From Swiss-Prot:
Acts as a sulfur carrier required for 2-thiolation of mcm(5)S(2)U at tRNA wobble positions of cytosolic tRNA(Lys), tRNA(Glu) and tRNA(Gln). Serves as sulfur donor in tRNA 2-thiolation reaction by being thiocarboxylated (-COSH) at its C-terminus by the MOCS3 homolog UBA4. The sulfur is then transferred to tRNA to form 2-thiolation of mcm(5)S(2)U. Prior mcm(5) tRNA modification by the elongator complex is required for 2-thiolation. Also acts as a ubiquitin-like protein (UBL) that is covalently conjugated via an isopeptide bond to lysine residues of target proteins such as AHP1. Pathway: tRNA modification; 5-methoxycarbonylmethyl-2-thiouridine-tRNA biosynthesis. The keyword Hydrolase does not apply. One of its GO terms (biological process) is tRNA thio-modification. InterPro entries: Beta-grasp_dom_sf, Mopterin_synth/thiamin_S_b, Urm1. It comes from the Eukaryota. Gene3D superfamilies: 3.10.20.30. Keywords: Cytoplasm, Isopeptide bond, tRNA processing, Ubl conjugation pathway. Belongs to the URM1 family. There is a cross-link at residue 121 (Glycyl lysine isopeptide (Gly-Lys) (interchain with K-? in acceptor proteins)). Coiled coil: none annotated. This is Ubiquitin-related modifier 1.
Length: 121
């Protein structure tokens, strides 16, 4: 696997260890691996200002595309930079709509589950 750029970490940066899972066929675009234990930066550059801000689900999605997904078919996971409609997201077994959706700030030990509810026929 080649080197992939990620947000630079300073010596004072902290990492969050989280579990990310993919089901419903999504695992096929994430190296055919259902469960990933990741250490991600606790802060991520803001898309608007470039300043560090606490890592959110939106930042995690970008991180996953840049650092975990090897498949080139990003459109199966995201549309216009957001999680594709038809993909259920659970944060610690709760619907992400209850947690603030893409604005939810990732916490140490979180379990984020992406479930595709779309199936070909």
């Amino acid at each position: 696997m080649g080197s992939i750029a990620s947000p630079s970490l300073s010596s004072s940066s902290q990492l969050l260890t989280i579990t990310v899972e993919f089901t419903g066929g999504l695992e096929s675009i994430f190296n055919n691996t259902r469960k990933h234990t990741l250490s991600i930066p606790a802060t991520y550059p803001s898309p608007s200002t470039g300043e560090p801000e606490p890592t959110s689900v939106a930042s995690l999605v970008h991180y996953l595309i840049e650092n975990v997904m090897e498949d080139t078919r990003q459109e199966l996971f995201v549309v216009d930079g957001a999680v594709r409609p038809g993909i259920l997201v659970l944060i610690n077994d709760a619907d992400w709509e209850l947690e603030g959706e893409e604005k939810y700030q990732i916490q140490q030990g979180d379990n984020i589950l992406f479930v595709s509810t779309l199936h070909g026929g």
